UniProtKB/Swiss-Prot annotation:
Domain of life: Bacteria
Xref: Pfam families: UDPG_MGDP_dh (PF00984), UDPG_MGDP_dh_C (PF03720), UDPG_MGDP_dh_N (PF03721)
Residues reported to bind NAD(+): 13-14, 33, 85, 126, 338
Function: Catalyzes the four-electron oxidation of UDP-N-acetyl-D-mannosamine (UDP-ManNAc), reducing NAD(+) and releasing UDP-N-acetylmannosaminuronic acid (UDP-ManNAcA).
PANTHER family (UniProt xref): UDP-N-ACETYL-D-MANNOSAMINE DEHYDROGENASE (PTHR43491:SF1)
GO biological process, one term: enterobacterial common antigen biosynthetic process
Keyword Isomerase included in the entry's annotation: no
UniProt name for this protein: UDP-N-acetyl-D-mannosamine dehydrogenase
Subunit architecture: Homodimer.
Pathway in which the depicted protein is active: Bacterial outer membrane biogenesis; enterobacterial common antigen biosynthesis
Species of origin: Salmonella typhimurium (strain LT2 / SGSC1412 / ATCC 700720)
Keywords noted in UniProt: NAD, Oxidoreductase
Length: 420
């Protein structure tokens, strides 16, 4: 069965680019999102997120009649579910969004449909989703019931793209295809090949789920090494960035760069999915998470020390000292604030500090709710002119262009080594 109509459930940082990629190949794409504001923006041919090159693709797709957004699922040949999968307070995976998405498409499923879960999920999530669908559509058969002969095919195909490069990597990167049966994998591969230039690498759904978790856990462990090294170097009076530069001259050493912690909806979340299912075995993965989650607390302590130094060297009261935090996003040059350590650091500073806390984030127009009323969103030049203590949290291009003489006479906490 060919794919004439494709529906993408969830029009966020992954879902919207995916929908746009299919629409750019002149497929009829229906994007579904519960956010009416996002739906309205997309239907105007605009985008509600910051992602280079995405805006033009969406504009052309909407104007060409190949992409439309709605809040209610409709009948389609294929469904891709790209909704959030956060963790609960105890670090257990929260599959509520996936369950809601599955139940929303169940009434419009037809024989021959393909359902793909893209959301990063714990091992077994695809089988669980198939169970939810089967429970709601007893008139159809699913892979766990009928194998290769199932009426509905189901697969797990994780995204593996870099924010800021999504429209390139979505097309160029290889794709892991984890069907519940070989037929499911074959159909999922055929769907992605509509726009994919990379290779479709086929496996089963459980291995595909674990592959995504493994990729992000590997990165988290390596970042934890760099972050722990930065703590050690601070105690020893060593420039960690110079140290890493020298160590990386070894042909078999490639240490990553330290920072204020780890953010985003993948690396800061996914390792916990492994830990939750394998608490006795995943000791290194758990420790890496604890190291990276602890780094923001260390940064706040450095800011407190800088304020103390400022007070000792000036005649200002604490309430007169202004602190400027540079960056809120979880990585450079994007507007995505999910799980960003910079957000928590700015919030902690503002709650502790009796003076004004300025925030500079060139990729947003207003402060998120958790900072509204605590901080002041400021322009770059104004913050540089007013602040006594500068806190570098995200190495946006605008910040890397700041001349050294603009910061060298200040009290500086540089978590990214931009002003070293």
């Amino acid at each position: 069965m060919s794919f004439t109509t494709i529906s993408v459930i969830g029009l966020g940082y992954i879902g919207l680019p995916t929908a746009a990629a299919f629409a750019s190949r002149q497929k009829q794409v229906i994007g579904v999102d519960i956010n009416q504001h996002a739906v309205d923006i997309i239907n105007r041919g605009e985008i509600h997120i910051v992602e280079p090159a995405l805006g033009n693709v969406v504009k052309m797709a909407v104007e060409g009649g190949f992409l439309r957004a709605t809040t209610t699922p409709v009948e389609a040949d294929a469904y891709l579910i790209a909704v959030p999968t956060p963790f609960k307070g105890d670090h257990d995976p929260d599959m509520a969004y996936v369950e809601a998405a599955a139940k929303s498409i169940a009434p419009v499923l037809k024989k021959g449909a393909l359902v793909i879960l893209e959301s990063t999920s714990p091992v077994g999530a695809t089988e669980q989703m198939a169970g939810w669908l089967a429970g709601m559509r007893t008139d159809l058969t699913f892979p766990q019931q009928a194998g290769e002969q199932a009426d509905v095919n189901i697969a797990y195909c994780p995204e593996r793209v870099l924010p800021g490069q999504v429209m390139v990597e979505l097309i160029k990167n290889d794709r892991v295809i984890g069907g519940m049966t070989p037929v499911c994998s074959a159909r999922a591969s055929a769907l992605y090949k509509i726009f994919l230039e990379g290779e479709c690498v086929v496996t089963n759904s459980r291995t595909a789920e674990m592959c995504k978790l493994t990729e992000n856990s590997f990165r988290d462990v390596n970042i934890a090494f760099a972050n722990e090294l930065s703590l050690i170097c601070a105690e020893q009076g060593i420039n960690v960035w110079e140290l890493i530069r020298l160590a990386n001259r070894h042909p078999r050493v490639n240490i990553l760069q330290p920072g204020p912690g780890v953010g985003g909806h993948c690396i800061a979340v996914d390792p916990w999915f492994i830990v939750a299912q394998n608490p006795q075995q995943a000791r290194l993965i758990r420790t890496a998470r604890e190291v990276n989650d602890g780094k923001p607390h260390w940064v706040v302590d450095q800011v407190k020390a800088a304020v103390t130094d400022c007070l000792a060297a000036t005649d200002k009261r604490a309430s007169e000292v202004k602190i400027a935090c540079f960056g809120l996003a979880f990585k450079p040059n994007i507007d995505d604030l999910r799980e960003s350590p910079a957000m928590g650091i700015a919030q902690s500073i503002a709650r502790w500090h009796s003076g004004e806390t300025l925030v500079v984030e060139p990729n947003i127009r207003q402060l998120p709710k958790k900072l509204d009323g605590l901080c002041t969103l400021a322009k770059l030049d104004a913050a540089l002119a007013a602040a006594d203590v500068l806190v570098m949290l995200v190495d946006h291009d605008e910040f890397k262009a700041i001349p050294g003489d603009a910061v060298h006479q200040r009290y500086v906490v540089d978590t990214k080594g931009v002003w070293r």
